[in-house]
């Protein structure tokens, strides 16, 4: 619809120029938006204002000239000039009816597009160290990353999902030491357990498992070798749990990429040597430093310590070089908000390598405040007591968890109330939206049982010309906006845009259903309304699918 209006405007502007009503045939880009207030029409454009400088005319005069020369269009009821020169368009009801045909035809592809033109995009998300179970913060990142990937794919991008396994470095060594010390305790040895080791019962459970498998054998090895064995075993056990928890949350990856493989393949050392040759890495105080300040970071960063051990930054450089070497047009990382300071140094590495940092995006996911009946849930990472992703899914279910994690922009902190997530009332957003889908499924079954529809008939063939109630036209307008909403969500990388849309559509349907019966004594009117609610059901399902939430037929 926006494209049709754009062509109407441009056609009118060209004819106005030909008639001498405009001074230039160069027309700058315009915006066409749905106004906030219904009184301002269905669409509004700033064409006259952005053309004022080129035309050297007052915007309202430009608007008058364009409107006077526009072709008549059967779906435009009237146009108005508002304020400094906005052109407002009021559409006839019949303008919205073709949306129903399109929804029936496209079905589960309605809302999809070629916006991404097949460009290759990698979305790397969660990527938690395999040193403990995924917690509530990881859960929000998982919901965001997976939804972003779904939306980009639906919008025509070729998307790859990846999990980066931090299976090398100090934290893995600390994990191994933590398990080894717990195992020693289980062997009856007196050991001191440092506070910087990993706490929590899961460490004791891994130690007990390892004790049962090879406790005697381990006890005969020197500590360094025993710690290394414990580290590998523990990381595998934890990673297996992470995989299972993510699958239960509806998240699956195309690739799990090991940090250790970067060292084994020599890619880390190769990256360091490449940057040395570019004079981007230099030596100072026995360490090797990356000139990140040259590329916009606040200071230079160490890549190899004076003891010869590489930093995490070194492997991160190699990893991001490897990503671009795989041919991705765009790389998106989903990080916790506490990694904000890391963005500039990765951008610096990308720019220094000769690649383009504008092809690299970081989504920073803010913290989750976990509540129960409005009261904070106590958590302590130091004591190892925290609410895991598995805990949340077990208590409230995948659908409620994902939907609530996506209910606000990831730029903002989120209050997640476990009790609200379990409610089967309109106070629970996921129930509010899913209930629309289930209710319409019930309406369609009733329509078949009452012979309003044939069982084999697609419920979209009704007479839509009978849809004239204000609530019906409002629903049609909301349905027509879904493709643009998906495109906006893809362009901004903000999945909460889909959440907000679904809540609005659900609210409009509930309002309509409370005022009007779908199945009435008038069979033709009933069939028209069935076409409408079937379209609502389809779009609710498509939107929920993008967020990784199911659309139940019964509730």
From Swiss-Prot:
Entry EC number(s): 6.1.1.19
GO cellular component: cytoplasm
Recorded catalytic activity of this chain's protein: tRNA(Arg) + L-arginine + ATP = L-arginyl-tRNA(Arg) + AMP + diphosphate
EC class of the enzyme, as a word: ligase
GO biological process assignments: arginyl-tRNA aminoacylation
Motif ('HIGH' region): 128-138
Keyword Transferase: no
PANTHER family for the chain: ARGININE--TRNA LIGASE, CYTOPLASMIC, ARGINYL-TRNA SYNTHETASE
Subunit structure as annotated in this protein's UniProt entry: Monomer.
Family: Belongs to the class-I aminoacyl-tRNA synthetase family.
Name listed for the protein in its UniProt record: Arginine--tRNA ligase
Species of origin: Desulforapulum autotrophicum (strain ATCC 43914 / DSM 3382 / VKM B-1955 / HRM2)
């Amino acid at each position: 619809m926006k494209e049709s209006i754009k062509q109407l405007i441009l056609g009118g502007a060209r004819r106005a120029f030909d008639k001498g009503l405009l001074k230039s045939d160069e027309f700058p880009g315009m915006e066409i938006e749905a106004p906030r207030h219904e009184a301002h029409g269905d669409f509004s454009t700033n064409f006259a204002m952005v053309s004022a400088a080129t035309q050297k005319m007052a915007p309202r005069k430009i608007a008058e000239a364009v409107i006077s020369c526009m072709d008549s269009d059967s779906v435009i009821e009237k146009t108005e000039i508002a304020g400094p020169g906005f052109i407002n368009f009021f559409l006839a009801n019949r303008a919205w009816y073709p949306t129903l045909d399109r929804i029936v035809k496209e079905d589960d592809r309605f809302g999809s597009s070629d916006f991404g033109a097949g460009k290759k995009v990698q979305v790397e998300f969660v990527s938690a160290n395999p040193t403990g179970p995924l917690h509530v913060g990881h859960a929000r990142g998982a919901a965001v990353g997976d939804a972003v990937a779904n939306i980009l794919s639906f919008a025509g991008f070729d998307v790859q999902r990846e999990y980066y396994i931090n299976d090398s470095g100090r934290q893995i060594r600390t994990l191994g030491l933590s398990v080894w010390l717990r195992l020693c305790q289980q062997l009856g040895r007196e050991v001191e357990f440092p506070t910087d080791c990993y706490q929590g019962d899961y460490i004791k459970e891994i130690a007990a498992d390892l004790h049962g498998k090879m406790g005697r054998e381990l006890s005969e090895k020197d500590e360094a070798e025993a710690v290394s064995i414990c580290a590998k075993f523990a990381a595998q056990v934890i990673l297996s749990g992470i995989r299972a928890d993510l699958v239960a949350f509806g998240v699956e990856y195309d690739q799990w990429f090991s940090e250790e493989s970067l060292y084994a393949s020599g890619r880390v050392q190769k990256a360091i040597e490449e940057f040395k040759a570019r004079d981007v890495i230099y030596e100072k105080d026995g360490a090797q430093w990356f000139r990140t300040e040259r590329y916009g970071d606040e200071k230079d960063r160490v890549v190899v310590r004076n003891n010869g051990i590489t930093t995490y930054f070194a492997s991160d450089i190699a990893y991001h070089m490897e990503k671009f070497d795989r041919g991705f047009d765009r790389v998106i990382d989903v990080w916790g908000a506490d990694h904000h300071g890391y963005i500039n140094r990765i951008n610096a590495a990308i720019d220094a390598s000769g690649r383009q940092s504008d092809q690299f995006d970081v989504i920073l996911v803010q913290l989750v405040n976990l509540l129960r009946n409005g009261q904070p849930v106590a958590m302590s990472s130091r004591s190892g007591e925290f609410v895991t992703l598995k805990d949340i899914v077990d208590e409230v279910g995948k659908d409620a968890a994902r939907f609530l994690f996506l209910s606000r922009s990831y730029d903002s902190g989120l209050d997640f109330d476990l009790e609200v997530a379990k409610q089967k009332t309109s106070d629970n957003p996921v129930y509010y939206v899913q209930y629309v889908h289930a209710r319409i499924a019930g309406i369609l079954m009733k329509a078949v049982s009452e012979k309003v529809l044939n069982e084999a008939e697609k419920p979209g063939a009704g007479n839509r010309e009978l849809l004239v109630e204000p609530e019906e036209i409002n629903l049609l307008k909301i349905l027509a906006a879904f493709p643009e909403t998906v495109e906006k969500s893809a362009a901004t990388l903000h999945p909460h845009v889909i959440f907000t849309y679904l809540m609005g559509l659900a609210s409009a349907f509930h309002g309509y259903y409370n005022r009007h019966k779908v199945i009435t004594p008038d069979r033709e009117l009933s069939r028209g309304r069935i076409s409408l609610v079937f379209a609502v059901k389809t779009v609710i399902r498509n939107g929920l699918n993008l967020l990784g939430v199911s659309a139940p037929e019964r509730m």
